[in-house]
Regions:
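Gly/Ser/Thr-rich phosphate-binding loop
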Residues: 175-180, 189-254, 273
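Conserved ATP-binding/catalytic segment of the ANL
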Residues: 262, 276-280, 286-320
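Conserved pre-ATP/AMP-binding loop-to-beta segment of ANL
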Residues: 61, 74-92, 99, 122-128
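Conserved AMP-binding/adenylation subdomain of ANL enzymes
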Residues: 111-128, 138-176, 187-194
């Protein structure tokens, strides 16, 4: 469904259902969404959201056998009508203050995001990813969906993360890699005993990948020691279509507590006067590349503040 929306030239707006009714209503209204696709279990929430917005919104229940028949007869089946600079994805950042910001990403952005995953993780067509992250998040959508699609490999798509089933899925489907967040790493450390883990066939796995927030070096080392699987710390944002930095794959040496080096884009560290700082000097992490967002939707002021020439300010501090 998500791929079909983008292929047809429409723009998808993924919704985080745990964001709450008020925030979801704001996103639907602000984005000007015309259609909501909903599962049966979330249909009541979808109806409440539609009641709160002024724009007309069609509701389609997607897990009904006849949901396609309910689409208006005027809907047209299209060939590929997209250009690489066209808008494909409008994803809202949660943000810690104020209203969420809508990030406009083009077809070029999301394909380049997938390419950056492929390059940094040396993905081949025989790789298989385990996706346990939600697709309303840039990590889940770009890293574990677009990465495999661009590299012509495959993925196992889970409804949600389950610490109980995680390693079982990897064993059953011979997954070669996975992308998670630090809270999932901690959950796996606490869930499995060494004996439970050793009883599974995990011979296919190449590495695990951590992103979305900093991974504590102690947790990182404990995971690798217990499970004997290399964990690659990375960094990315919604605005950068996920990956910016990544540690290299084994046998190359990783640096604990660091998100790594650029793959597929350029990174510099600037001071408050927009000058590049010397080595080992803390400054603002700025990135440039084909994966960088087009703009914040309906927010030209924030868009302008976020760029200096071709460099995007990530809002994070770092050093080289």
């Amino acid at each position: 469904l998500m791929m079909g929306i983008m292929y047809s030239g429409m723009i998808q707006v993924p919704l985080n259902l745990v964001a709450g009714e008020e925030q979801l209503s704001y996103i639907v209204k602000h984005s000007g969404s015309k259609i909501i696709f909903s599962s049966s279990k979330n249909i009541d929430l979808a109806k409440k959201i539609i009641q709160k917005v002024s724009n007309e919104v069609m509701l389609i229940e997607i897990d009904k056998d006849n949901f396609i028949d309910e689409i208006d007869d005027n809907f047209e089946i299209l060939e590929d009508v997209t250009e690489y600079k066209d808008n494909a994805l409008l994803m809202y950042t949660s943000g810690t203050t104020g209203k969420p910001k809508g990030v406009i990403l083009s077809h070029e952005n999301i394909i380049q995001g997938g390419k950056n995953v492929m390059i940094s993780h040396e993905m081949k067509s025989n790789d298989r990813a385990l996706c346990v992250l939600p697709l309303y998040h840039i990590n889940g959508l770009i890293v574990t969906v677009m990465g495999p699609l661009v590299s012509q490999s495959s993925l196992v798509l889970c409804e949600k993360f389950s610490a109980t089933n995680f390693w079982n899925y990897i064993s059953k489907y011979s997954c070669t890699w996975f992308s998670v967040v630090p809270t999932i790493i901690s959950a796996l450390l606490n869930k499995y005993s060494k004996d439970e883990f050793n009883s599974l066939d995990l011979s296919a796995i190449r590495f695990g990948r951590s992103a979305s927030s900093a991974l504590a070096p102690e947790t990182h080392k404990n995971f690798e020691k217990k499970f004997e699987i290399k964990m690659i710390e990375t960094m990315g944002l919604t605005e950068t279509c996920a990956p910016i930095l990544s540690n290299p794959l084994p046998p190359k040496k990783i640096k604990y507590g660091s998100p790594g080096i650029p793959y597929g884009n350029k990174v510099i560290i600037l001071d408050n006067t927009f000058k590049e700082v010397p080595r080992n000097t803390v400054g603002q992490i700025c990135v440039s590349g084909k994966n960088i967002m087009k703009e914040y939707y309906k927010n030209p002021e924030e868009t302008k503040k976020s760029f200096y020439k071709n460099w995007f300010f990530t809002g994070d501090l770092g050093l080289m």
